[in-house]
Amino acid sequence: MPLADGTAVPLSQWEGRWLVINYWAEWCGPCRDEIPELNELHAERAATGMVVLGVNYDGLVQPKLGEVIGRMDIKFPTLLKDPEPTYGYGRPEQLPVTVLINPAREVHRVLIGPQTASALLAAAAS
């Protein structure tokens, strides 16, 4: 999967881990509010079981995408391509939306509205 930082990562790199796919946009206030929680979750859990991946809702490309990621202080990887076709959960129609993909690569939950790290961990456990 190509990332905004210019690297590419195969999905197999995250084998056995939960994927937290977060759709965000710069103009979305609640999206900006949840970024620190998502940064924290990714920093604490990416190596051990839960990877946060961002998707810019507006489909920005470089260099604009990198500028916005910097302004919003997003620390987790941002995908260049929407993973929705891979998982089939439907393109979000509002923001923010966070999709939980379980370690078996199945859609576990689609969550609408801003999320906290604790809420995402609880949703994964339910």
Protein language model annotation of sequence segments:
Residues 32-72, 81-88:
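Structural microenvironment flanking redox-active thiols in thiol-disulfide oxidoreductases
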Residues 18, 27, 42-45, 115, ...:
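Sec/Tat-exported extracytoplasmic proteins
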Residues 1, 57, 115:
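Hydrophobic pocket-lining residues within nucleotide cofactor-binding pockets
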Residues 20-21, 52, 98:
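Hydrophobic beta-strand anchors of alpha/beta hydrolase catalytic cores
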Residues 1-11:
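N-terminal "domain-start" segment that seeds a small globular fold
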Residues 9-32:
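Short active-site neighborhood of thiol/selenol oxidoreductases, capturing the structured segment around
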Residues 67-75, 80-125:
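Thiol/disulfide oxidoreductase modules built on the thioredoxin-like
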